[in-house]
Amino acid sequence: MSLPNTSSASEDKMCEGNRTAMASPQLLPLVVVLSSISLVTVGLNLLVLYAVRSERKLHTVGNLYIVSLSVADLIVGAVVMPMNILYLIMTKWSLGRPLCLFWLSMDYVASTASIFSVFILCIDRYRSVQQPLRYLRYRTKTRASATILGAWFLSFLWVIPILGWHHFTPLAPELREDKCETDFYNVTWFKIMTAIINFYLPTLLMLWFYVKIYKAVRRHCQHRQLTNGSLPTFLEIKLRSEDAKEGAKKPGKESPWGVQKRPSRDPTGGLDQKSTSEDPKVTSPTVFSQEGERETVTRPCFRLDVMQTQPVPEGDARGSKANDQTLSQPKMDEQSLSTCRRISETSEDQTLVDRQSFSRTTDSDTSIEPGLGKVKARSRSNSGLDYIKVTWKRLRSHSRQYVSGLHLNRERKAAKQLGCIMAAFILCWIPYFIFFMVIAFCNSCCSEPVHMFTIWLGYINSTLNPLIYPLCNENFKKTFKKILHIRS
């Protein structure tokens, strides 16, 4: 590619005498290889454009920048590469000045548009990661199309100096008809300025943007890991063994609601030692379960404050045998029970008993004072409401985490794709621009074979870009396989 003065023809002044040596029968294998690269570049970029057009999943705002990049790469493969190959095997330019200017214009415009397309793609990814909510309202196809048109407009500005340089500088040297070169091929200050604007400045900005993107994605991943640590994404399901069953038969260790009791406070503000649990992670009791192993579900729930009540006097109790497996015969009135179920705002891991086992409770397992029948029914009703509230909050939490996970995955995939595109772009173009800066100040340092190699290395970037998309994007990969009838 030829940002400033990339055409190999334009370097004849710097590498005089080398072109005749290159135009020999030994170039035939090289011409075959370069022609193959040109054909592959055209085919791959046409495949990208057809894939985006035919697959609805690829009709996204971000892929508009990919389309712009593919169009620029397609021009490089279909126009710039073939004419460069043609000029490579000729000892002199014999196609006329108009065709020469057309080739130079396409070379400069397409190569610059390719660079600018990568640049605006990087900006889009940066804003999507750094300002997701604000940029989401701004990120529309209309605005993306306007940005792309702006990049191409700036690229087409190359036509002005290519076609009209002699109008601005009357002292421009007279050009030979057998050479295809720009009027400013020997204007060092202009070439250096355009090299900085077209390559060095965008590259530095893209590297800065990508570092920011990488840090943001890494920060989001760490934040999500911390969030998942306090709010598990999935229910923790454990199979209770016989040991757990035997441990649940011990009196005083059970909660009829399947929720661990919090230590209640006495009127003086101290903790009631009777209600203090030894293990904060005690699982739900087995008093409501059937014989054998059962399944308990541990869910992050809201703490349930259970007020400590006075036990029923021994003379009022009925069914002493059942007392070992029931509520330890609490004597409660409706007012005290209404205060037994205060839900705390902070969430912690609690263990809820399986509601199905709760419904299978036998009469002997739940023998309570007859006067507490209404209280029992109301308590179950309150427990059901509490369970629904907790379940609803958990569903909302899972939904937020799911959406956040999808957004994070998109960020990571987009960052990976952009990183590959930038790496290929820099590796392909940095040799040319380094060599260009050297020969801009040292004409005798020019080597035509080296210069041609750096130019074609830049051209190959247009071949690599379409290969990067399916490697970094699953939708592109599936669409390519579908179009090419490749079975997974």
Swiss-Prot record:
The chain crosses the membrane at residues 30-50, 65-89, 98-123, 145-164, 189-211, 418-441, 448-470. The lineage of its organism: Eukaryota, Metazoa, Chordata, Craniata, Vertebrata. The modification Phosphothreonine is found at residues 140, 142. This is Histamine H1 receptor. Histamine binds at residues 107, 112, 198, 432. Residues 322-337 have a biased composition (Polar residues). It comes from the Eukaryota. Pfam families: 7tm_1 (PF00001). It comes from Mus musculus (Mouse). Phosphorylation at sites in the second and third cytoplasmic loops independently contribute to agonist-induced receptor down-regulation. One of its GO terms (biological process) is G protein-coupled receptor signaling pathway.
